[in-house]
Amino acid sequence: MANPKIPQEFWSSYIVEKLRRTNPHIMLCFDESKYIKGGSVVYIPQAGTQPSVVKNRGFGAATAVQRGDTAVMYGLDVFTTDPTAITNAEANEISYEKTDSVLGDHTGTLAETIGDELTYSWVKGVKPAVGGGTTVEFLPSGRQIPTAGTATAVNAEDGQTGTRKAFTYKEVQLMQAKFNKDNVARDNRYAMVESYMYQQFIDSLSANQMAAFQATADLVNGVVGKFAGFTFLERSSVLALTTAGVFRLPGEALEATDNLASIFWQKDSVTKALGDTKLFQDMDNPLYYGDIHSGLVKMGGRCRRQDWKGVGLVVQAS
């Protein structure tokens, strides 16, 4: 029986707010939550070939063609926390409200994990395969820009060794040009930059560039500045790839030669869908002599375009 002090409505609003505050990028994408099919899948139609335009068409009927639309899809992942028991003795004897603390741990862990997974889902695509089933693909190398700064020692915290070329403002300008060339909408462009790559970017700016960048910061909403049309966010971990270009899973330990990456996107080019959010509570459990709590959130996402336009990476280069 659910604890009346913690109704499901409160949990749902609490976890959504925690997701928003911990992961600003969750709100900076297209929301397809209302299009979830069967509680776990979202299909995104992909328009077929555009019609040709003929100047001064000659006499006679034009040939009618049918546009062959396709679809891409993504499933919602189910994120759950390990159950936590609060014994009756703890509830009666400790000097702080442990239930609130435990729920804070659950929401914080869920938010951090989901934030990492959503970024990964934007570079991973699933689409229906001919004859049934699905195929999986990843952001192609043509949408990845290597860093081009001076050789800089990596940080040992991520498990890397050696040096990588530093991330500079010039790579951001190249990404801006790529988006412009692809006719990607010029508003609502964002960049999520790994912490050390962000520091390298800052170091590459001139005094005037730095002043302009800092003047556009909105730290309350997680924005550290704007440059070349991109609104910058900073995060301790974003993405990582092997030297062969294979994406590391979120939370996976890195090899010494792996490379970190920062992601760039336009808001309408990537998506998320939030499904069920539920707090499980087993009050006065006779086996644990107390209350047991755990949480569940269903969420998924991907790049909305099969051609991957509107998404790009800046990847460390040796």
Regions from the language model: what does each represent?
Residues 213-227, 314-318:
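Short, cationic low-complexity segments
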Residues 260-318:
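C-terminal appended segment following the main domain
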Residues 196-200, 238-241, 305:
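Short, catalytically relevant binding-site loops at active-site mouths
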Residues 221-283:
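Glycine/small-residue-rich hydrophobic helix-like segments
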Residues 52-55, 94, 200-203, 303-304:
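Short helix/loop capping segments that flank catalytic or ligand/cofactor-binding pockets
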Residues 1-73, 309-310, 314-316:
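N-terminal "assembly arms/tails" that initiate or stabilize quaternary assembly
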Residues 44, 69-139, 180-195, 278-303:
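Long, contiguous amphipathic alpha-helices that act as assembly "spine/axial" helices in icosahedral shell
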Residues 131-220:
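Extended, solvent-exposed, turn-rich assembly/linker loops in the middle of proteins
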